[in-house]
């Protein structure tokens, strides 16, 4: 609080506090970019994906899932230093908001995610990747249910 509060008095900073989902979408859609400076290995990066869904480029450190979510120079910039962040902020207008949204649709939409999960489950079933059930009749029946065809499981 001692470090952050004084910075909020800057004329270029507007502290909006906690927001609901609708307000978050409005903020992301109207943002020039999402500046995500976390320096821990975030495993998924939902906030980056939410920004892309709004067509907003992301400027981020290259740790955690960032390199998997953001395509450097296309949907944002992956930065290693303060100087990289400065250049990225300066260059963010060169990125296409339409491309950010299209990349979200191609990689992270609900339809895409469902399709990817279906394909993964199908491959696992085809490879018989589950260990053979041994022991009780109930365990053997459960294993048999996992062997269903893709059509009966996913359609």
Predicted regions and their residues:
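Nucleotide-activated donor-binding/catalytic signature segment of Leloir-type glycosyltransferases, i.e.
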Residues: 2-26
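Short acidic alpha-helix that forms the nucleotide-activated donor recognition element
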Residues: 20-31, 53, 71
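Nucleotide-sugar-dependent
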Residues: 36-47, 67-68
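Short glycine/acidic-rich beta->alpha loop that forms part of the nucleotide-sugar donor binding site
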Residues: 42-45, 52, 62
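Short hydrophobic beta-strand element within catalytic cores of glycosyltransferases
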Residues: 57-60
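Short acidic/histidine- and often glycine-rich active-site loop of Leloir-type glycosyltransferases
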Residues: 62-73, 77-79
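C-terminal "capping" alpha-helix adjacent to the active site of nucleotide-linked donor transferases
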Residues: 77-99
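A short, well-ordered alpha-helix in the C-terminal region of glycosyltransferases
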Residues: 94-110, 116-119
């Amino acid at each position: 609080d001692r470090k952050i509060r004084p910075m909020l008095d800057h004329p270029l900073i507007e502290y909006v506090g906690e927001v609901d989902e609708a307000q978050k979408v409005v903020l992301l859609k109207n943002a020039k970019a999402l500046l995500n400076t976390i320096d821990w290995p975030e495993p998924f990066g939902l906030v980056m994906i939410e920004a892309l869904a709004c067509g907003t480029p992301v400027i981020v450190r290259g740790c955690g899932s960032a390199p998997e979510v953001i395509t450097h120079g296309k949907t944002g910039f992956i930065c290693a230093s303060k100087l990289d962040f400065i250049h990225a902020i300066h260059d963010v207008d060169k990125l296409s908001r339409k491309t950010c949204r299209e990349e979200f649709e191609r990689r992270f939409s609900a339809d895409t995610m469902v399709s990817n999960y279906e394909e993964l489950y199908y491959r696992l079933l085809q490879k018989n990747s589950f260990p053979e059930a041994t022991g009780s009749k109930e365990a053997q029946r459960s294993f048999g249910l996992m062997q269903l065809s893709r059509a009966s499981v996913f359609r």
